[in-house]
Each structure stands twice: as C-alpha cells, then as structure tokens.
Amino acid sequence: MRLSIVLPTYNERGNIEPLLSQLLPLQEQFDLEILVVDDDSADGTAEHVRQLAQRHPCLRLIRRVGRSGLASAIKEGLLDATGDLALVMDSDGQHEPAGVLRAVQTLQQGDFDLVVGSRFHQEAEIRGLSGRREQGSTWANGAARFSLHRRYAGLTDYMSGFFALRLEPVLPLLRAVDVNGFKFLYELLAVSHGRLRVAEVPLTFQPRLSGTSKLDLAIF
C-alpha cells in the first residue's frame, strides 16, 4: 500500500528534520512518499529538505515561488501525491507522528473515505494550544457544524489540519476545494455535500518543536 504524507511548510527549518526522523520508519510498513510543500521559506527550509532528500529517496520537495497559503499548499500536495492513501499534517511537530499510523489503520480497516484527527475527541490530548486559539477553534467548529451536511454533525473538529483520505474516490472533490475559503478540511466537507464516509480518531496536540505558532491570532 502506497502512502503519501503531505507536509506544508513555511519557515520550519528547525522542525522539519525532527519530524521526518519520526515519519521515515513508516517505510517499514508502507511504500512511503513524503511531500514537503514549501511556500518559499526565508529560513532555508527548502534547501534543507533538498539535502535530506538526497539521503531519503521517498522525500520530495515542492517549492512554491509566487504562490502561498496553507490551503493551496495542501491542495497542491494532495493533487501531486501518488499514493493510494494520503495524509496531511502540520510540519511544526504539534501533531503527534504516532497519530499517523492510527489514522491510516482506521482508514484501511473501516469503510471510510476520510479519517480526521480531532483535538476535541473525548480521548484527545491538547498540550501547547493557546487559550485564544482553543476558544477560536471551539467557536469555529460550532459554526461549521450548523453549516455542513447533517451527515457530518457527529464530528468534533472540522478545522483540523490532520486528516487521512483515500485519494482515488476523493480526487474529484479535492479539485473543487476553494483554497481561498475557511479551512481546507472544512471546504472539502462542504463541497462533498454529505457524500464522504468519515471517521474521527483522537489526536494528541503538543507544543511546537521550535519557533512560534503562526496561528495564535487566528481562529484555528
């Protein structure tokens, strides 16, 4: 089974190598592809990834010059992915890499198109999420629940940046996602109009490995 992991980056040079060191052992279980989608970072993230890719053939760099934005980076990475399954996660270390296997196994073993890692699942752990950001996420999730198809009413984290999906059935929807919209996962659910079979798994959300969050002033 081929698994593509999409990592959008912007100035994550201090975080990307520690994260990759935890993801690369997945090669023992999957035909692994890791796509780092970099928005022309000023801190040398792309150059560092390019050097790492010389030692790890499963690693690919997509360097975006003149294009920017988290949602568009996710979309570009997913459309370029070659796996049967794909997983999107943050590149700053706040998403626990151990959750990758949990999400992918749930996707494989269940009859699902999409598996969401939820920060607000009853078994989730949140460490390092600012009070402002947690409050904003709670508000945004409440609003999202009322705006999406009722089939998704049982989900707890529509704003999650951690999710796994089956590429082939979801590909037409990915192409239709508005990258200028709210959040990528939310927009994907919106364009699906209730057609996706979705499950959630608990997510451990932890402090950044290095640097400061770019989202503390946002509602994510």
Regions found by a protein language model. Name each.
Residues 38-47, 93:
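A conserved acidic beta->alpha catalytic loop
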Residues 2-4, 33, 187:
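Cell-envelope/extracellular polymer assembly enzymes that use nucleotide-activated donors
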Residues 12-27:
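Short, well-formed alpha-helical segments that are part of the catalytic scaffolds
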Residues 153, 177-180, 189-206:
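Catalytic donor-sugar/metal-binding loop of nucleotide-sugar-dependent glycosyltransferases
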Residues 30-41, 62-64:
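Short beta-strand/loop segment that forms part of the nucleotide-sugar
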Residues 62-80, 85, 97-182, 208-220:
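Acceptor/aglycone-binding surface of glycosyltransferases and processive sugar-polymer synthases
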